[in-house]
């Protein structure tokens, strides 16, 4: 099985988890100039951009620790481009950035893991 297929499986698991938590699915694997958005969800009127990370173990800090500052900046840029394509921005839309970290068989949802400020 390819890495891409494995990643897609974890993203689907994350999507279902978030849907059960009450979020609404909008899009997955949105490739934009400068980055990719794993999942785009809605929580009421809030756009939720979700980074899904998987690590087999927490030997090197686990999945959540792998979302570095540089990765955050790429996600912020990709989300800004995505919003601009809809005539919106961080100033005109309610947005948040969540991380759904899967380490081994443990799933951890981190709402508001970082922000655009």
Swiss-Prot record:
Gene Ontology MF terms in the entry: nucleic acid binding
Intrachain disulfide bonds: none
Tree of life domain: Bacteria
Family membership noted in the UniProt record: Belongs to the UPF0102 family.
Protein name: UPF0102 protein Spro_4337
């Amino acid at each position: 099985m390819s890495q891409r297929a494995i990643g897609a499986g974890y993203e689907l698991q994350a999507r279902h988890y978030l849907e059960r938590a009450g979020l609404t699915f909008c899009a997955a694997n949105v490739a934009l100039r400068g980055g990719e958005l794993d999942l785009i969800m809605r929580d009421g009127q809030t756009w939720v951009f979700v980074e899904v990370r998987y690590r087999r173990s927490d030997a090197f800090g686990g999945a959540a620790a792998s979302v570095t500052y540089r990765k955050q900046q790429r996600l912020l840029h990709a989300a800004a481009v995505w919003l601009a394509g809809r005539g919106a921005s961080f100033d005109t839309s309610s947005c948040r950035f969540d991380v759904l970290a899967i380490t081994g068989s443990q799933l951890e949802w981190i709402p508001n893991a970082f922000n655009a400020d």
